[in-house]
Amino acid sequence: MTQPRQALLDAFGVDLPDELLSLALTHRSYAYEHGGLPTNERLEFLGDAVLSLTITDELFHRHPDRSEGDLAKLRASVVNTQALAYVARNLSDGGLGVYLLLGRGETNTGGADKSSILADGMESLLGAIYLHHGIEVARQVILRLFGTLLDAAPTLGAGLDWKTSLQELTAARGMGVPSYVVTSTGPDHDKEFTAVVVVMDTEYGSGIGHSKKEAEQKAASAAWKALDVLGGVGKTSV
C-alpha cells in the first residue's frame, strides 16, 4: 500500500484490505477506461444507508423534543452532497479527491473536486468500512468525521447552502450581510471563477470553482469555518 493511501486510511482511523480500498476509490469513468472494472457504486449504495441510519439515530437521541419534521430538516443539513463533499475536502492534505481513481475525461475536467464525485466517494468508503469492520466501527467513524456538522445542524440550511448559512450567522452576530467579489480567468469554454467573501470590510474566505455559484459557495464555506462556527457553535463573537 502506498503512503498516500495509508494517509487516507489514517484520516478515517481504520485499516482496509488493499482490494477493498481500491474498489471504494474506483469511479465508473476509470472502470470504463480500463476494460470494465468493478466500480464503487455498490459500496456507495451501502454507505449511503449506513450514513443515513447513523445520522438519523444520533439526531433522534440528541434532540428528544424535536418533531419528525424538524429531525428530517436537521438530517437534510448533514446528509447531502455538499456536506459529504465538505467532509471529503477536509479529510487530509489534498482531501479525498487526490486518492480517487478517475478516468482521463473526469480528471481533465476537475472531477477530483466535483462535489458529486467526492460525495459518492465518501459514501463508498463508509460502505467499505461497514463491510469490513461492522456497524459500530462505521458509526464511530461517521460521528467523528461529521461531528462538527452534527453540532452545527440547527444553524445550517437544508442542503448545506453555505451562503444562506453564513448570512444567517452574520445576521445573528450583528455583522451585516456578506458580500462577494468574483473574478474569472480563462477562455469562455473553460473559465475558472474565484470568489472572496467580505464581512464588515474584512475578507473571511475565498473559493475557486468552474462556476460563479460554486466559487461563492466555497468562499462562504471557508468564511463560515473562519468564524469558528465549526469549532464552537453558538459563539456570539469572532
UniProtKB/Swiss-Prot annotation:
Catalytic activity: Endonucleolytic cleavage to 5'-phosphomonoester
Organism: Mycobacterium leprae (strain TN)
Function of the protein: Digests double-stranded RNA. Involved in the processing of primary rRNA transcript to yield the immediate precursors to the large and small rRNAs (23S and 16S). Processes some mRNAs, and tRNAs when they are encoded in the rRNA operon. Processes pre-crRNA and tracrRNA of type II CRISPR loci if present in the organism.
Coarse class of the protein's main subcellular location: cytoplasm
InterPro entries registered for this protein in UniProt: dsRBD_dom, RNase_III, RNase_III_dom, RNase_III_sf
Binding site for Mg(2+): E44, D120, E123
Domain of life: Bacteria
Self-association and partners: Homodimer.
Keywords from the UniProt entry: Cytoplasm, Endonuclease, Hydrolase, Magnesium, Metal-binding, mRNA processing, Nuclease, RNA-binding, rRNA processing, rRNA-binding, tRNA processing
RNase III domain residues: 4-134
Compartments in which it is found: Cytoplasm
Active site location: D48, E123
Full protein name: Ribonuclease 3
Example GO BP: tRNA processing
Entry-linked SMART domains: DSRM (SM00358), RIBOc (SM00535)
Record gene name: rnc
Any one of the GO CC terms: cytoplasm
Residue intervals of the DRBM domain: 161-229
Gene Ontology molecular functions: double-stranded RNA binding; metal ion binding; ribonuclease III activity; rRNA binding
